[in-house]
Amino acid sequence: MVRVMATGVFDIIHLGHIHYLRESKKLGDELVVVVARDSTARKNGKVPIFDENSRLKLVSELKPVDRAILGHEDDMMKTVVEVMPDIITLGYDQKFDEADLKRKLDQIGVNSRIVRISKYDGNLNSSSMVRKKIMELIGERF
């Protein structure tokens, strides 16, 4: 069985998220999705609208997802060791240096393949674009 791990904040679910998860699922038999903790999202400059437990519930209900878990606050590698994925997928816009990630995986003895998932070709394919569109629509009404 090939286990795939996808990660993200997953705030305001949109078609870009669905594309990322569908493409990730195609790579294996089981898709485990790691939802970022609120504190982790904030450390990376994101302020989630939905709290971590709500985002976890939303993600767990998506069709491609076999299992959704919350990530560790202090060390992503702890989550990797718990999941032991054969493949780790990264979204097109996730700020991971793939070579650095591979080095960290090697250091902890995890031999996961890293796959960067392509960008979804469509409108509103990122949370920031959705937020921007909402603000534009609100601005038009006032």
Swiss-Prot record:
Known pathway: Cofactor biosynthesis; FAD biosynthesis; FAD from FMN: step 1/1
Top EC group: transferase
Keywords, alphabetical: ATP-binding, FAD, Flavoprotein, FMN, Nucleotide-binding, Nucleotidyltransferase, Transferase
Keyword Signal: no
InterPro entries cross-referenced by the UniProt entry: Archaeal_FAD_synthase, Cyt_trans-like, FAD_synth_RibL, Rossmann-like_a/b/a_fold
Catalytic activity as recorded in UniProt: FMN + ATP + H(+) = FAD + diphosphate
EC number: 2.7.7.2
Residues noted as binding ATP in the record, renumbered to the chain: 9-10, 14-17, 93, 120
GO molecular function: ATP binding; FMN adenylyltransferase activity
GO biological process: FAD biosynthetic process; FMN metabolic process
One family name in Pfam for this protein: CTP_transf_like
TM region positions: none
Superkingdom of source: Archaea
Needed cofactors: a divalent metal cation
Family the UniProt entry places it in: Belongs to the archaeal FAD synthase family.
Main function: Catalyzes the transfer of the AMP portion of ATP to flavin mononucleotide (FMN) to produce flavin adenine dinucleotide (FAD) coenzyme.
Subunit structure and binding partners: Homodimer.
The protein's name: FAD synthase
